[in-house]
Amino acid sequence: MARTKKANDEVPTDSDSLKLKVAKQAAKLVKDEMVVGLGSGSTANLFIQELGKRIVEEELYIYGVPTSFDSRMVASTAGIPLISLDQCGEIDIAVDGADEVCKSTLSLIKGGGGCHTMEKIVDYHAKEFIVLADEGKLVDSLGDKTPVPLEVIPFAYSTILNKLLKMNTAPVIRTGSGKMGPVITDNGNMIIDVFISIDDAEETEIMLNNIPGVLENGVFSKCDKVLIGTSKKVEILKK
């Protein structure tokens, strides 16, 4: 008897298949006895699941460093042994997703899931930082379509909003679904989303972090390699 499709069943999209394609290829880059930074988000979760399969099938000794409560749960389910940042001397490779990738500079905007602070700590700490994305995430100019998230200390949110308004931006406090009020990060902070012109990713990253009360922002100026899923193949972009 054929299964009746329910209204809330998720139907795979072209984007989903491209994400899975890059996730599978990224999982092959991990070698035995590596410590791996585990990013957060839909593409990173696929990578975590594929890495878990390799660990089981090939009996690999690999440890993961999660960047969020969500990635911790996905990794635990996938059978990846986990350690904290202070337990590992170094991270061999970090694999993460992105909301936008600039074609020319490989700078990124991350943080759609509100995990960018922990992601940046782990990603920047790694010997090699690899980003996974489908071709729809590629842009010519960073920040034209996606706002930059700022994780802010609640005590300072109003002064940060005023500072951003004086910079001729339109900041918005991120609110969640399922509850009233602002989104609260794993670190207990709020998120302000702001559209801002980004001519130099590194300068913008530093400038936003210099605003008192901003813990971290979603501009990532450092990235070693990007795996882009296209309909024909996985393209590898390097700096």
UniProtKB/Swiss-Prot annotation:
GO terms for biological process: D-ribose metabolic process; pentose-phosphate shunt, non-oxidative branch. Substrate binds at residues 40-43, 96-99, 110-113, 137. The keyword Ribonucleoprotein does not apply. It catalyses: aldehydo-D-ribose 5-phosphate = D-ribulose 5-phosphate. Pathway: Carbohydrate degradation; pentose phosphate pathway; D-ribose 5-phosphate from D-ribulose 5-phosphate (non-oxidative stage): step 1/1. CDD domains: RPI_A. GO terms for molecular function: ribose-5-phosphate isomerase activity. The active site is at 119 (proton acceptor). Pfam families: Rib_5-P_isom_A (PF06026). Keywords: Isomerase. It comes from the Archaea. It is an enzyme of class 5 (isomerase). GO terms for cellular component: cytosol. Catalyzes the reversible conversion of ribose-5-phosphate to ribulose 5-phosphate. Belongs to the ribose 5-phosphate isomerase family. Homodimer. This is Ribose-5-phosphate isomerase A. The lineage of its organism: Archaea, Methanobacteriati, Methanobacteriota, Methanomada group, Methanococci.
